[in-house]
């Protein structure tokens, strides 16, 4: 049967001819409708109100006029005449009358609002859903019942099933009350209950009750909350769904890859797919890994700048590198110190450690190793004050020249030669137009904008989509999207040479979100799931080249769309929803 909306029965108090109170409900008994004349006031009351209003404004004007005259003549205000006393009495009386007539009704409106179920917001029509009345018409034989009530038709979108109190046990209700009162911290539910999903359910219901906001549409079931405990997310109340599309095959270094992309931007996957098609038809792309090293830069302070310089010379002395490396490398069997770069700002010294981290992205690994070195240095430099384990010279999750120049994570360059016929048939443009557009837009335009590492069309689109799909840290899209796109005509101007240089791709295939089921499946699709047993670090390096190849495909397709004047048309076709969201309610 169709679902319809019905308001809760409104309790009505009625009296019979003998004055006894009769209780009934509006669903079963209908009082005679009130006539408009029932709401009108007696004529005498209208006249009284008009008289009081006139009196109020008259005496108020009189008193203000007298007050002004006294100020002008420097007469003391406390000296009053009989007319002024009478005017004051009339003013007070009229105010009392007006407050009694209008104020009581205003106050009563609040008291009625607390008991009238039709006026309070807690009776949300969206939450009061019942099935259509299926009682036989014979139930309407009693003359006191009116069964001609027409029920409104449900016109809202289907309501997503959410957690209701019926799914909560008595123990859950007690815990919810304790969390609301503050006797049980919300963050401790997992440890107290020993069940991560139950903790998320209780925290979610508590949040809805305390905020008065519904979490409809935010899924709770179908997720392994044990897998995120202590490593991915705290205070869980559900999970967000992001669609995953595939682009490819991407022919890179002689192998084909189907690239998973998690995004909500229409046309992005389609554009990347077209770029992959053009690369495939032209014989594929090649990539080179230039560097692989994660960085961390603690900051320490000394009493004088000279002492800071002493430590700088010590750290950069090749004779001391092996000693420092032994202390650094003992933190992990994968961490291997590569270099130390120092910078001084007054009495402050910033030491940028760079090391290989295997298949992990490596931030935790390098941080632990740096802490070991700091502890070791304090033996020889007791006047060293450690300000912080990270001093932003790393630089993590920030656009910084040091990453653009020195690199961070994986530094990759990827290139391809796109044949002339492919440019015309697949990309719908020509080589000369692409070369000119790249020079004016990606190089000159970015320079005019003062861009730092942003000499590209939309590298961050591809990086972020692949990062979310494979369980990387999306915040590291900032420096991982540093990219310069180069295009030039080759083979007598017939073919197009395109390349992307990305100095700081930060990712891993173990740790963090890579172990989640969905993200692990996407890594498995690319053949880089987990750590490589044969060659530690090879899986993460391969993933970095795939990211660069995906960026190459995305740059090629978007630049072609802009050169051919297809950008607006493609986004109007694939990136606009025809759904009227204003008509969807929850």
Curated annotation (Swiss-Prot):
Q: Which GO terms describe its biological process?
A: coenzyme A metabolic process; isoprenoid biosynthetic process; sterol biosynthetic process
**Which catalysed reactions does the entry list for this protein?**
(R)-mevalonate + 2 NADP(+) + CoA = (3S)-3-hydroxy-3-methylglutaryl-CoA + 2 NADPH + 2 H(+)
Query: Looking at the record's lineage, which domain of life comes first?
Result: Eukaryota
EC top class named in words: oxidoreductase
Principal localisation: endoplasmic reticulum
Q: Which InterPro entries match?
A: HMG_CoA_Rdtase, HMG_CoA_Rdtase_cat_sf, HMG_CoA_Rdtase_CS, HMG_CoA_Rdtase_eu_arc, HMG_CoA_Rdtase_N, HMG_CoA_Rdtase_NAD(P)-bd_sf, HMG_CoA_Rdtase_sub-bd_dom_sf
State the membrane topology: Multi-pass membrane protein
Q: Name one GO molecular function term.
A: hydroxymethylglutaryl-CoA reductase (NADPH) activity
Cite the entry's keywords alphabetically. Answer: Endoplasmic reticulum, Glycoprotein, Isoprene biosynthesis, Membrane, Mitochondrion, NADP, Oxidoreductase, Plastid, Transmembrane, Transmembrane helix
Q: Where is this region: Linker?
A: 108-170
Is Glycoprotein given among the entry's keywords? yes
Q: In which pathway does it act?
A: Metabolic intermediate biosynthesis; (R)-mevalonate biosynthesis; (R)-mevalonate from acetyl-CoA: step 3/3
Please verify whether the record's keywords include Cell membrane.
no
* Residues linked to a glycan: 575
Q: Name one GO cellular component term.
A: mitochondrial membrane
> Family, per the entry?
Belongs to the HMG-CoA reductase family.
Q: What is this protein called?
A: 3-hydroxy-3-methylglutaryl-coenzyme A reductase 3
Classification of source organism = Eukaryota, Viridiplantae, Streptophyta, Embryophyta, Tracheophyta
**Encoded by which gene?**
HMGR3
